[in-house]
Swiss-Prot record:
Residues 30-49 are annotated as: Disordered. The gene is RNASE1. Keywords: Disulfide bond, Endonuclease, Glycoprotein, Hydrolase, Lyase, Nuclease, Secreted, Signal. Endonuclease that catalyzes the cleavage of RNA on the 3' side of pyrimidine nucleotides. Acts on single-stranded and double-stranded RNA. Belongs to the pancreatic ribonuclease family. GO terms for molecular function: lyase activity; nucleic acid binding; ribonuclease A activity. One of its GO terms (cellular component) is extracellular region. The keyword Transcription regulation does not apply. This is Ribonuclease pancreatic. It catalyses: an [RNA] containing cytidine + H2O = an [RNA]-3'-cytidine-3'-phosphate + a 5'-hydroxy-ribonucleotide-3'-[RNA]; an [RNA] containing uridine + H2O = an [RNA]-3'-uridine-3'-phosphate + a 5'-hydroxy-ribonucleotide-3'-[RNA]. InterPro entries: RNaseA, RNaseA-like_dom_sf, RNaseA_AS, RNaseA_domain. Glycans are attached at N62, N87.
Length: 149
């Protein structure tokens, strides 16, 4: 009888762990935004290899080359504060986008025309521009980089 109970408990444990474990490893939209768009450590400093390094580090060249990406060189708190600034319509028509009230230091990375996976090669361009981000949650946090203006 004791062995039967142990087997049932073990089976339940395996079932629960199998159900919980995948949710523990799933990256949240907010964490993905930080990984793909935040570089608070500095800027490209006009280095032509900045985008190549950052796109690889941000896991955006795994399986294919992401065609366009923007990195923001401002404190995370400043970017999160945009979620309470001017509400604008997103490119996809949703109403959860917000425009920064001031221009931010950003680096734009664009895949060069002749570049093919696995040798993703990016053009690096620095700008001071307003950004538009999508925000979700309570408290509202950035989950998608929508545009620069």
């Amino acid at each position: 009888m004791g062995l039967e109970k142990s087997f049932i408990l073990f089976s339940l444990l395996v079932l629960v762990l199998g159900w919980v474990q995948p949710s523990l490893s799933k990256e949240s939209s907010a964490d993905k935004f930080k990984r793909q768009h935040m570089d608070t450590e500095g800027s490209s400093n006009s280095s032509p290899t900045y985008c190549n390094q950052m796109m690889t580090r941000g896991d955006m060249t795994n399986g294919s080359c992401k065609p366009v990406n923007t990195f923001v060189h401002e404190p995370l708190a400043d970017v999160q504060a945009i979620c309470s600034q001017e509400n604008v319509t997103c490119k996809n028509g949703k109403k959860n986008c917000y425009k920064s009230t001031s221009a931010l230091h950003i680096t734009d990375c664009r895949l060069k025309g002749n570049s093919k996976y696995p040798n993703c090669d990016y053009k690096t361009s620095d700008y001071q521009k307003h950004i538009i981000i999508a925000c979700d949650g309570n408290p509202s946090v950035p989950v998608h980089f929508d545009a620069t203006v």
